[in-house]
Amino acid sequence: MIGLAFAAFVFNTSEFLPVGLLPDMAASLNESVSFMGLVITGYAWVVSIMSLPLALLTARFERKKLLLFLLGLFAICHFAVLWVDSFWSLYATRIGVALAHSIFWSIMNPLAARMAPAGKRATGLAAVMGGTIVATVLGVPLGTKMGHLFGWAESFFVIGAAAFLVLMLLWYVLPQCPSRSAGSLKSLPVILKRPALLQLYGVTMITMLGQFTAYSFISPIL
């Protein structure tokens, strides 16, 4: 459970870290703050649009291998930030992270519930949510402070290093976890024909896009 909580921590810290570092990133890459905001909104668009199809595409994958792959992709994209020299190269790394994010949260809660001891599924889910909460109240502020002191790219690199350590921990402690899902991309048209689900997806997308739009420019305003 601790390993899964740490995984949630690094993903959520990375998700919101650009909010506090947006002015630094814009100045470093010679872009306006408003244009640099696409790093955040683009991330949100990718997660909103790709979560469902990618979850279906990977539905039959063994869960441990999939999670380790996602953490590996996440870490590599963060390490690559040290070498970005333009907005678009940075954007490419964030798209990679967003794709990993899209699948990560589709498997994390079910995986936590399965890995929890019998009768303690709620504890497993609480551990994952605890990682999310700690990321919001501690990880993002510390990452932002580190970015101001040592450089925004270095802050992302540290998150990548943390993700690599989590990967090694989960490789060691997490047992094999065969998929129990019967979904596939072929079921996507059927899902999209259900009005209730479409309404739920629409509300979720609008909520997340509104949240990211509001968060994006809090730092410059403050």
What are these regions (language model features)?
Residues 49-88:
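Conserved MFS/SLC helix-loop-helix module at the cytosolic interface between two early adjacent transmembrane helices
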Residues 25-26, 57-58, 112, 138, ...:
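Interfacial helix-cap and linker-helix signal at transmembrane-aqueous boundaries
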Residues 160-180:
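C-terminal membrane-cytosol helix-exit motif in multi-pass small-molecule transporters
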Residues 174-203:
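Juxtamembrane intracellular "pre-TM" segments in multi-pass secondary transporters
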Residues 87, 93-131:
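Cytoplasmic helix-loop-helix junction between adjacent transmembrane helices
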Residues 19, 198-221:
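Extracytoplasmic gate region of multi-pass secondary transporters
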Residues 16, 44-52, 136-137:
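Residue-level signature of mid-helix packing/kink "hotspots" within the transmembrane helices
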Residues 3-36, 51-54, 214-219:
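Extracytoplasmic
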